C-alpha cells in the first residue's frame, strides 16, 4: 500500500510538472500572439489597405505593443522545455542559453515603439512606424524563434 502511494504521488508530481511547463509555454505563446495581433492583424493590414486606416485602432495597437514588449523578459525567464501543443512557432532553446543577448533585443523594440508613439497620423506615418518596429522584432526572431510546422 505504501509503495502504491509513493508511485501514485510520484506520477502526480510528474504530471503536475509537465502541466506547469505547458502553462509557461502557453503564457509565452499568448504574449507573442498578442504582439502579432497588434503588429500584423492591425498595423500591417492598415498599411496594406486590407483594413481602413483607423487612428484609434492604430494607437491602441501601439499601446498594446508597448505593454506586451515590456513583459517579454519576465515571461521568458523560465524555459518550459516544451512547445505549445500544435503551435506553429516556438521559442528556441537559445533563449535560455544566451539569455543576456535575448534580453538585449528588447530595449531596441521598446525604443522603436517610443519613437513612433503619438506621432502616427496617417497611413504613411503608420508604414514608417511598422517598418521601424518590425525590423527590431525581426532582429530577435531570426535567432530566437523556431518554426515548428
Curated annotation (Swiss-Prot):
For this UniProt record, give its keywords in alphabetical order, as a comma-separated list. Electron transport, Heme, Iron, Metal-binding, Periplasm, Signal, Transport
> What are the GO cellular component annotations?
periplasmic space
Where in the sequence is the signal peptide annotated?
1-20
Record-level Gene Ontology MF annotations: electron transfer activity; heme binding; iron ion binding
Where does this protein reside within or beyond the cell? Periplasm
What does the PTM comment of the record read? Binds 1 heme c group covalently per subunit.
Q: Where does heme c bind?
A: 32, 137, 140-141
Biological process GO annotation list?
electron transport chain
Q: Which PROSITE patterns match?
A: CYTCII
Kindly give the Gene3D superfamilies that the UniProt entry links to this protein: Cytochrome c/b562
Highest rank taxon of the organism: Bacteria
| Principal location | periplasm
Q: How does it assemble?
A: Monomer.
The record describes the protein's role as: Low-spin monoheme cytochrome.
Recorded protein name is Cytochrome c-555
Native organism: Bradyrhizobium diazoefficiens (strain JCM 10833 / BCRC 13528 / IAM 13628 / NBRC 14792 / USDA 110)
Amino acid at each position: 500500500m505504501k509503495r502504491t502511494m509513493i508511485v501514485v504521488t510520484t506520477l502526480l508530481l510528474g504530471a503536475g510538472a509537465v502541466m506547469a511547463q505547458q502553462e509557461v509555454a502557453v503564457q509565452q505563446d499568448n504574449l507573442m500572439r498578442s504582439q502579432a495581433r497588434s503588429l500584423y492583424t492591425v498595423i500591417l493590414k492598415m498599411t496594406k489597405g486590407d483594413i481602413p486606416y483607423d487612428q484609434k485602432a492604430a494607437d491602441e495597437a501601439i499601446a498594446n505593443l508597448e505593454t506586451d514588449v515590456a513583459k517579454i523578459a519576465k515571461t521568458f525567464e523560465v524555459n518550459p522545455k516544451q512547445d505549445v501543443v500544435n503551435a506553429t512557432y516556438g521559442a528556441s532553446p537559445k533563449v535560455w542559453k544566451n539569455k543576456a543577448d535575448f534580453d538585449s533585443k528588447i530595449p531596441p523594440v521598446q525604443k522603436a515603439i517610443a519613437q513612433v508613439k503619438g506621432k502616427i497620423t496617417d497611413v504613411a506615418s503608420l508604414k514608417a512606424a511598422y517598418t521601424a518596429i518590425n525590423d527590431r522584432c525581426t532582429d530577435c526572431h531570426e535567432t530566437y524563434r523556431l518554426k515548428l510546422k
